[in-house]
Amino acid sequence: MRNLKLLQTLEFKDIQAPGKPQCFSLRTEPGTVLIGSEHGLIEVDPVTREVKNEIPLVAEGFLPEDKSGCIVGIQDLLDQESVCIATASGDVILCNLSTHQLECVGSVASGISVMSWSPDQELVLLATGQQTLIMMTKDFEPIMEQQIHQDDFGESKFITVGWGKKETQFHGSEGRQAAFQIQTHESALPWDDHRPRVTWRGDGQFFAVSVVCPETGARKVRVWNREFALQSTSEPVPGLGPALAWKPSGSLIASTQNKPNQQDVVFFEKNGLLHGQFTLPFLKDEVKVNDLLWNADSSVLAVWLEDLQREEDSVLKTYVQLWTVGNYHWYLNECLPFSTYGKSKIVSLMWDPVIPYRLHVLCQGWHYLCYDWRWTTDRSSGDNESDLANVAVIDGNRILVTVFQQTVVPPPMCTYRLLLPHPVNQVTFCALPKKSNDLAVLDASNQISVYKCGDSPSMDPTVKLGAVGGNGFKVSLRTPHLEKRYKIQFESNEDQETNPLKLSLLSWIEEDIFLAICHSQCSPQQSVIHRLTVVPCEVDEEQGQLSVSSSISVDGIIISMCCNSKTKSVALQLADGQILKYIWESPSLAVEPWKNPGGFPIQFPYPCIQTELAMIGGEECVLGLTDRCRFFINDTEVASNITSFAVYDEFLLLTTHSHTCQCYCLKDASIKTLQAGLSSSHVSNGEILRKVERGSRIVTVVPQDTKLILQMPRGNLEVVHHRALVLAQIRKWLDKIMFKEAFECMRKLRINLNLIHDHNPEVFLQNVETFIRQIDCVNHINLFFTELKEEDVTKTMYPPPVPSSVQQSRDPGGTKLDLICDALRVAMENINPHKYCLPILTSHVKKTTPELEIVLQKVHELQGNAPSDPDAVSAEEALKYLLLLVDVNELYDHSLGTYDFDLVLMVAEKSQKDPKEYLPFLNTLKKMETNYQRFTIDKYLKRYEKAIGHLSKCGPEYFSECLNLIKDKNLYNEALKLYPPTSQEYKDISIAYGEHLMEEHQYEPAGLVFARCGAHEKALSAFLTCGSWQQTLCMAAQLNMTEEQLAGLGRTLAGKLAEQRKHSDAAIVLEQYTQDYEEAVLLLLEGAAWEEALRLVYKYNRLDIIETNIKPSILEAYKNYMAFLESQSATFSRHKERLLEVRELKERAQQVDLDDEMPHGQEADLFSETSSIVSGSEMSSKYSHSNSRISARSSKNRRKAERKKHSLKEGSPLEDLALLEALNEVVQSLDKLKDEVYRILKVLFLFEFDEQGRELQKTFQDTLQLVERSLPEIWTLTYQQNSAMPVLGPSSTANSIMASYQQQKTSVPVLDAELFVPPKINRKTQWKLSLLE
């Protein structure tokens, strides 16, 4: 759905040269034009309008002096730096334009009618006056000469296998006589010049020749190969015209055919058979086709037509039509009418061989025109809610308009057609947002027809419905109506006749103001901006007038123009990429350079064929796309693989060569973020990217909707709903409290319905009644309930592109599900509880803890009291629906848990249960006492806590059964709440609970339970086992033990405490309960409690113990500390040195591996491609054993292997980790030793062991300093550095990537991360004794 848009026009005329132009050719490298006349050859630069060379051929005798000479062909030869000229008299001349030297390289006595060079300029073909074809090499050496008329069909002659005869075949309505009809041949067309036509295929392997057969007088097309062997002859085609053009892509040969009532362009295959056609918009014998020309990429077919003389005084014209094809339909995209008289009569035209959409036209009077076209999609702006997403396609004198807001139909179908009196060249939509559905059409007669959408008193005859019409169908579409046609008033009509496309880039900026571009007549490097204003006139006049209210000249050729209706600015792009700015609301027509935020003028590095204006991060920017898929924002290239783009609202949508469509929000974006996102091969945000079909291009975006229209290369359409557009539109609807629109869109496009709440929980909970009233559908509300989940989808599935400022309002005492269910249920009960009965039931079921009992009770109420409301549901319907939400067995159990047997029977009847199974069970239950009945039900339902509650009310005779259930199900805490603490049942349960805790080795809790219920002996045993000596002695006091029993208990306790290294507690027990203070002192000395031992010595006045026990113990402890410190210091130093050595060895090994793995020589590319595969198998080979015993290793073996994972054995794989672990242990043990050293230093000083104290203090200080100095050297690497992923980027090299990869292979697992954190040393601990310094 694209049209051809004229970018620029280059023109020169009135060159002072003799004679009249006859033909022309192009020199692609210098960009000049070679024009031949009856006098000779001239070379003109179309930009500077200067004559570069003039080669007279009359003076050299190659052309006659009577001006009757004719040049039939000109060809620029790049490799020979010369120009080849062929004259009708038969001379082939080689001209060097640098030296002006002429050389006649050959002559044909019978004359030359056609000279045609192959596309590769290796061969040249001459058609002579003797009806022969001569093929020569590029050095003009003859290869072969053959007759142009051949009797043979060619090498590709069809083979008949003899199946059936013509006489026996079916001939349709013509009957059997058709088999005996003699085929007649129509002669050539009356206006046919009978000259041969030659055309080459794009690759130069074949050429086709159209000639008039001397026998039949009809045209035939023959195909020859490069070796000059005839391949095929076309089937007889009545009315075949002389025009011939082989499609460069090689598939079809175009020609023309006159039919009884029309004139067609027909296509031949290489085998000579017809394959398709399209009809020209003229009647038979109204025009003749002079020539057909394909552009370089086979996308545009130019048809050169000329009016035939019908009346004496009729004005004859020549037309150049540009036809394009899409979805197997041919569109007439442009029509250029020229006069057949005077300077504007066309002499020749040709496509540029390098620039595909550049057309060169040569007219009489030395008038030359050069047109540059590009593809464009003419669509409405989409800046307003009333915009219908219109897209207009030009097809001759018709405009095919598709309204994508209401219909999506594939081209060439459309919503409606606009019929105009002349072929259309340009179409534009109004830039005003409220008028964006109005469109203006510029036709070939330079009239502008304005169509406006609105109420019209009658149906406009120029507007015809397309795909939305039909008998019996009511059309809801408001079609536009023709308001008026405007004639543009030019200062000179002569310019319009010589250049039919005087105006380009037409834009409708205000209701009565247009902007258009025209090339300057004064200078080829200037453009003129015209401001066209509607001339006031009478309303009843059929035709209005547009006058040029103001004009301004711009240095440079304007090739594109785009508008922004919000800022009222227009961006004009010059051919060199420079951007100019024009504010259309300014009183004067003035332009200025477009500047970036830094104040510098913006210039695209390359000219762009599509430009748009967009607000990016609050700054208005110019976006451009080149024909080479390079995408620019201002003067910054952000991507080089963009095939199309569109700006919609605050979004930028792009399609790429990687067959993706990306959508970016421009509201808070920047050029750098867009550049980073488009250059990244992986897009993290799932909203941004989606895959599309290969070759897709953006057509338009439907406003206030989620539809993105894409067109495939063949022409068919595809509608996609881009996730970013969908979510953005849903968020807008939710912000406007438009729940119904949001819900319908989410349901259709499978967006999680949790977003309705999670987008703004507070607003949703405040508007739940609005939500219910808007949805107003029971099934839809149930669907909403069923999709609810506790997850916040705005943080997981649909994170907003910009962090939301909405505060998540959540009740700290409830969950999301409970809040929504309760709020919606209250709203539905207020609105209509009978209508919304099923959603109310769903709200109970969907809660975090399903309230099935309440649900069943509501269903039971429905059974007894059927409401009279017509919207109400019956109990049976409610129960059926409930069975869809909840498993029937679970529902049966919950109904049983209500103790309502009527409800149980109602549910059981809907289940698959056998009545023989549940009826006896229910009958048995009915016969039981109420409490025991409920106990039995709860026990059956495994609700044991409720079961013991009911059983406890049944009386003492059931206590044994209750106690057994308590023991079996471990319900001690719940059971203790059911009986008073003074009861015997309470004591029995407590004793059972304590025994259970003893079995679980929870001795202290067991002792507390026993003590609480008065079982002191059991409590003493439990406290004694766990070493709780205070509670043990308390229980002993309550048991009234004798002193002897208490002393024995004390010694037992002291022994257990000593085993647990609780020497101080053991000493207290021995001193206070066994009066054995000497043993207490020994235990204190063993526990290094020096000061407490001295206290007891002085308390009992046993000073002799100081000499006999205390001092020797202190000296012994001193020696042990010294030995320990020396051992730790030596271990630390040894491990540290080994760690540094291991690290150095690993670095060397990595470098060796890197050198070994780096590929060299001719196989480097192969190894680089397979390196990832090799490394992957290498890493997994350690664990690819097939021995099943390894996988079945017991947990004991696994724990053993885990302990052996870090081995200090030299050369082990993780030796460095084992050394770090050992060094960490040394540091921590030394840090914990500070308090002990401080205590022994005090007693060493007290007993005058100053030398030993100073030595211990100095040794400990040296050891600590050694450790502190070594910490930065040992813990240099962090875990993140050690496990870094391969670094990629513009600054990376092959070596750095491979080194990072090697580092990744040897990285540590996550569980060992804490080893790389240096241990913390508490420097605040005071351990030094200043008296020893």
Swiss-Prot record:
Region (Disordered): 1177-1209
Maturation and modification: Phosphorylated.
Gene Ontology BP term (one): tRNA wobble base 5-methoxycarbonylmethyl-2-thiouridinylation
Phosphoprotein in keyword set: yes
Chief subcellular location: cytoplasm
Keywords of this entry: Cytoplasm, Nucleus, Phosphoprotein, tRNA processing
GO terms for cellular component: cytoplasm; cytosol; elongator holoenzyme complex; nucleus
GO molecular function: tRNA binding
Pathway, per record: tRNA modification; 5-methoxycarbonylmethyl-2-thiouridine-tRNA biosynthesis
SUPFAM superfamilies in alphabetical order: Tricorn protease domain 2
Domain of life from the UniProt record: Eukaryota
Pfam families listed in its UniProt record: A-sol_ELP1 (PF23925), Beta-prop_ELP1_1st (PF04762), Beta-prop_ELP1_2nd (PF23797), HB_ELP1 (PF23936), TPR_ELP1 (PF23878)
Modified residues (Phosphoserine): 805, 868, 1172, 1175
Feature: compositional bias, Basic residues: 1195-1207
Ranges for region Mediates dimerization: 886-1333
Location(s), subcellular: Cytoplasm; Nucleus
Family (UniProt): Belongs to the ELP1/IKA1 family.
Physiological role: Component of the elongator complex which is required for multiple tRNA modifications, including mcm5U (5-methoxycarbonylmethyl uridine), mcm5s2U (5-methoxycarbonylmethyl-2-thiouridine), and ncm5U (5-carbamoylmethyl uridine). The elongator complex catalyzes the formation of carboxymethyluridine in the wobble base at position 34 in tRNAs. Regulates the migration and branching of projection neurons in the developing cerebral cortex, through a process depending on alpha-tubulin acetylation. ELP1 binds to tRNA, mediating interaction of the elongator complex with tRNA.
Subunit structure of this chain's protein: Homodimer; dimerization promotes ELP1 stability and elongator complex formation. Component of the elongator complex which consists of ELP1, ELP2, ELP3, ELP4, ELP5 and ELP6. Interacts preferentially with MAP3K14/NIK followed by IKK-alpha and IKK-beta.
Protein name: Elongator complex protein 1
Originating species: Oryctolagus cuniculus
